[in-house]
Amino acid sequence: MTITISAPIGSGKSALAELLSDLLETPVFYEPVSQEENPILPLYYSDQEKYGFLLQIFFLNRRFNDIKNAYKTNNAIIDSSIYTDSIFLNRLYKDGKVTKEEFDVYHALFDNMMEEIEGLPYKKAPDLMIGINISAETELYRIGKRGREFEQDENLIQYYKNLLDDYNEWFESYDISPKLVIPGDDYDFVNNSYDKFVVLSKIVDKLQEIGTLTGDDLKKVRTKLSDII
């Protein structure tokens, strides 16, 4: 079973991944955002035109590696989706920050990497895609609250809003696997125990519905859920 959490910047996807990991007792493949793991990210925020294509190729390679490693662990949660990386590349292209040639190369590479091949021991689409829907106000508040210095430039505000719109449009049309959307403005699943219970219950219900969580595993998870509140 592979679960992917795909959500806008500042939505709480890493926090939700950690909660799910504890509940399902599965490892998480986190998005590389630290200076040590991803030295390109702060450079990108200082010069999107220079580093935009390079950053997206870095993420594409990392996400594909996560998919393969997730298969090896049998059950896993992936924090951030390879499918949504194209949202960032497309936004850069719309904003004139990457060239038509870079745009075409990226999408040709992505399509080639993500083509499902008959007989391959793993599939590339997740069993469940989880989205978190938040408002622009919530997004900007949380970006400011978490305090990553390279994200705080006021000139990035419109960029964040555009990405949020792009993400919502993408998630609405996503149909490669079952999906579930969490209303992130309505539930504080990080600090409120009841909200945490509700959100995790929604996810467990969906996993049961699609047949990836059954039998004794399902009973064990339901018992752990009841202990939250």
Q: Where in the sequence are the language-model features?
A:
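Pre-Walker A (Motif I) flank of P-loop NTPase domains
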Residues: 1-2
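Hydrophobic anchor at the beta1->P-loop junction of P-loop NTPases
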Residues: 5
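P-loop (Walker A) phosphate-binding loop of NTP-binding proteins
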Residues: 8
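Conserved lysine of the Walker
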Residues: 13
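Hydrophobic positions on the alpha1 helix immediately C-terminal to the Walker A/P-loop
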Residues: 16, 20
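Conserved substrate/cofactor phosphate-moiety recognition/catalytic segment
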Residues: 22-62, 88-89
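A glycine- and Lys/Arg-enriched "phosphate-lid" helix/loop adjacent to the NTP-binding pocket
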Residues: 88-165
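NTP-dependent small-molecule kinase module
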Residues: 144-229
